[in-house]
Amino acid sequence: MDLVQSTINQIGPLDDRAATAARRRQDMLTKPAGSLGRLEELSIRIAGITGRERPRLTNPAVIVMAADHGVARQGVSAFPAEVTPQMVLNFLRGGAAINVLARHVGARVIVVDIGVATDLPPHPDLVSRKLAYGTADFSQEPAMSHETARQAIAVGIACANQAIDSGVDLLATGEMGIANTTAASAVVAAITRRPASEVTGRGTGIDDSGLARKIAVIEQALHRHQPNPDDGLDVLAKVGGLEIGGLAGVILGAAARRVPVVIDGFIAGAAALIAATLAPAATAYMIAGHRSVERGHAAVFSHLDLQPLLDLNMRLGEGTGAVLAMSICQAACKILDEMATFAEAGVSEKV
């Protein structure tokens, strides 16, 4: 049995005992019941994910998958493909938005080259797991073989396992890849069965003619390849991206290890859809970090029945929204763990 299937087989339901105990404790804390709103439900959900009545999330990390896309040759992005390796080097220098926000919340940034179209210089903080020098142009042929798609998911699982083995107890999903909103839009359109025009946005800032071209490219690719909406591996192989597959693996790996995983923006959302088709039980381990302004993101969370924690008009990717949401997850758990109960504080309860 390969790593992907064995990981899927390990994903079970949330721990009802831990969640029930957490809810009972929430109701005994020195506050009116429900007065902390979604923080209370979030802490209870994380208790169910981790199997601990009073979970403590002290070692967060964001895994940033980087890869290139052959479909970029169709003029679907406002930026050239060489920006992908340039931004990876920026991540490694600590100068990108994800680095700043990760430092702010105390999260480690793990950068993975899963498919950048050029060779990157060795760096102690770069995980080199390159499967190909980018995907094929899916407007002309499938983005990758089914075997490569499965390998991409396996890379993500392995990265999640390595992080968790090192003590990470909260994961976030990040990515970098010019033209990856095109691949993500194709994935989302395929799995949610929505028209490409409903789930395709401007990405890095293309104009009206660029948007029309982007939608047309996606529509033609979906018509050409006919991806199976119920088979995330097929969708990934035909119209996805290597970093999208890698993030799907991160999500599956986290779920199998009972570690909460915060979903970032639109590209990470596409990865979450793929993970959910492969292992529906994995959805319970996903925390929707934020709502991107990218057009199809709302469709992702609607399909997964998840409610994002933040709505800040962000559309950068990299894991930026997810990392900010990590601090909310930590705060929710601290409320559950560190607040006194009525009995402990000597405070009278509601009559």
Curated annotation (Swiss-Prot):
Q: Which domain of life is it from?
A: Bacteria
Check the record and name the InterPro entries matching this protein: Nict_dMeBzImd_PRibTrfase, Nict_dMeBzImd_PRibTrfase_bact, Nict_dMeBzImd_PRibTrfase_N, Nict_dMeBzImd_PRibTrfase_sf
Task: Extract the signal peptide range.
Answer: none
Q: What is its EC number?
A: 2.4.2.21
Gene Ontology biological process terms in this record? cobalamin biosynthetic process
Keywords of this protein's UniProt record, alphabetized? Cobalamin biosynthesis, Glycosyltransferase, Transferase
The pathway to which it is assigned is:
Nucleoside biosynthesis; alpha-ribazole biosynthesis; alpha-ribazole from 5,6-dimethylbenzimidazole: step 1/2
Q: Which residues cross the membrane?
A: none
The molecular function GO annotations come to:
nicotinate-nucleotide-dimethylbenzimidazole phosphoribosyltransferase activity
Catalytic activity, per the record?
A: 5,6-dimethylbenzimidazole + nicotinate beta-D-ribonucleotide = alpha-ribazole 5'-phosphate + nicotinate + H(+)
Active site positions, chain numbering: E318
Q: Can the keyword Coiled coil be found in this entry's annotation?
A: no
Which Pfam families does the annotation name?
Answer: DBI_PRT
Purpose: Catalyzes the synthesis of alpha-ribazole-5'-phosphate from nicotinate mononucleotide (NAMN) and 5,6-dimethylbenzimidazole (DMB).
Q: Which NCBIfam families match?
A: cobT_DBIPRT (TIGR03160), PRK00105.1 (NF000996)
Q: Which family does it belong to?
A: Belongs to the CobT family.
- The name under which this protein is listed is Nicotinate-nucleotide--dimethylbenzimidazole phosphoribosyltransferase
Query: Which organism encodes this protein?
Result: Chloroflexus aurantiacus (strain ATCC 29366 / DSM 635 / J-10-fl)
Q: What is the lineage of its organism?
A: Bacteria, Bacillati, Chloroflexota, Chloroflexia, Chloroflexales
Q: Which gene encodes it?
A: cobT
